Design a protein with these regions (language model features):
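Repeated scaffold domains used in trafficking and secretory/extracellular systems
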Residues: 48-58, 95-114, 150-160, 193-205, ...
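C-terminal motif of bacterial Sec signal peptides marking the signal peptidase cleavage site
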Residues: 15-17
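Short beta-strand elements that form the blades of beta-propeller/WD-repeat-like
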Residues: 53-72, 105-126, 156, 161-171, ...
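Surface-exposed loop/turn elements that mediate protein-protein interactions on large endomembrane-trafficking
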Residues: 42-48, 72-98, 128-149, 171-193, ...
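Bacterial signal peptide processing site
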Residues: 19-22
Length: 421
């Protein structure tokens, strides 16, 4: 049983929380199934992909934004020095205008940290708005490149030289438009994926995708589509948009409860995890079995027949690991979350021993019970954790601690000297 619980938590924990989609003009499709096209601009094929977010962890440094009303500052946490500073080395800078390398307006949209050498920030807004890419020099300032014509681009992945995304607004019967933005030149390339194909996350040196497999092209008409898709299967692939290389990883039957993902719940250590659901009359679903698919071994195994509690779900996945390097993990997390009781309790499982342990240390500064949370993992294996926050969930305290110490209930961590702004 303990082994089963371990695998379950593993499954639950590593959700590749990423999926994205850029929009740009796509080629009109015929009724036949079109072949996907690779991005036309040459790109390195050895660099792995990683999801982009408003924070960035390279194993030595953690970059994240702090919001200050209508603007944000990019902060840098150095693990070796255990200090957090503004990412600005301009003498006498007040960090209150665009002249500051760390200053970014909030406005609409999101600021994403996308590379660290050189340091780049991408600002994305609603569909139709230009994408802005900033190259940041802490001592000199920042240079901005504006990319027009991206359309409904939802940027979500990077390989260090280019950004990638897809347009999820098109019908599943149509080929999925995708785009690539070269970070050096700013060149925008458009290409297509298979009809209904979506990006789910990263896998090996490619992207994890899913698409419907049907005997005939899916119709566009709503009722005809709903009838035709019932007999579809969902194929999960590792796909490299730079070369067009595609490797099938898993196949699942269509499931009306989770029509686009057929219960896909995450990826951990190159294994795919799927949850089966049982629909209820009140419109809710009950979690049933947990299945793990190991593409390398060609095996599919049911690891769990009944979930221990409906309130358990995914928590921390691959995003805590350094962007570059080995993406395997010993520690997998799960969270008990019950909005009815306002309870949120993180757990971690040691895959080597099968032990499941609760994180008991509480975050300071909150009027309600919230435990410390893991933000990132350093190259030396320690975890960067948030130890204090305000009622708006702004981070007020951080520390470094080994996983073993944290899960033993210790508060003997190395505190980060926080920037006082």
């Amino acid at each position: 049983m303990k082994k089963l619980i371990t695998l379950i938590l593993a499954a639950a924990l590593t959700l590749a929380a990423c999926a994205s989609a850029p929009d740009t003009a796509s080629t009109p499709l015929a009724n036949s199934t079109p072949e996907p096209t690779a991005a036309t601009t040459p790109a390195p094929t050895t660099a792995p992909f990683y999801p982009v977010a408003n924070s960035y962890n390279n194993g030595d440094t953690y970059y994240a934004f702090v919001h200050r009303g209508e603007d944000s500052l990019l902060l840098k946490t150095d693990y070796a020095a255990a200090t957090q500073t503004v990412n600005c080395a301009v003498p006498g800078c007040a960090h209150d205008s665009d002249a500051c390398p760390a200053y970014f307006t909030d406005g609409p949209g999101r600021n994403l940290v996308i590379t660290d050498d050189p340091l780049r920030v991408c600002h994305v807004e609603d569909s139709g708005c230009p994408v802005q890419i900033y190259t940041v020099d802490p001592a000199e300032g920042k240079a901005m490149q504006e990319i027009n014509g991206v359309g409904n681009c939802d940027i979500a992945y990077c390989d260090g030289t280019a950004l990638y995304g897809i347009d999820k607004t098109v019908l599943p019967s149509e080929a999925t438009p995708a785009c690539r933005i070269d970070l050096a030149s700013g060149q925008l390339d458009r290409f297509t994926m298979l009809p209904s194909e979506l990006m789910l996350g990263c896998y090996d040196d490619g992207l994890l995708t899913v698409h419907y497999v049907t005997d005939a092209p899916l119709p566009k008409n709503g009722e005809e589509y709903a009838a035709a898709v019932q007999s579809a299967t969902l194929e999960f692939d590792c796909w490299d948009p730079r070369t067009g290389t595609r490797t099938k990883l898993a196949e699942r039957l269509y499931n009306s409860t989770d029509a686009r993902f057929s219960g896909y719940d995450g990826t951990a250590n190159d294994k795919l995890y799927f949850v089966d659901y049982l629909p209820q009359n009140d419109g809710t679903d009950i979690k049933l079995s947990l299945t793990v698919v190991d593409p390398a071994m060609g095996t599919e195994e049911k690891m769990w027949d009944t979930w221990p509690d409906e309130h358990f779900g995914l928590s921390i996945g691959q995003r805590i690991l350094p962007v570059h390097g080995d993406q395997s993990t010993r520690w997998l997390g799960m969270c008990y979350s019950n909005s009815g009781t306002n309870r949120e309790i993180p757990y971690f499982m040691d895959l080597e021993t099968g032990e499941i342990k609760e994180v008991t240390q509480k975050r300071e500064g909150l009027s309600y019970d919230r435990r410390v949370t893991v933000l990132a993992q350093a190259n030396d294996g320690r975890w960067l954790i948030e130890t204090a926050a305000d009622e708006q969930r702004s981070c007020l305290g951080m520390a470094l601690i080994t996983p073993e110490q944290l899960l033993a209930g210790s508060t003997d961590w190395q505190e980060i000297t926080m920037w006082q702004g």
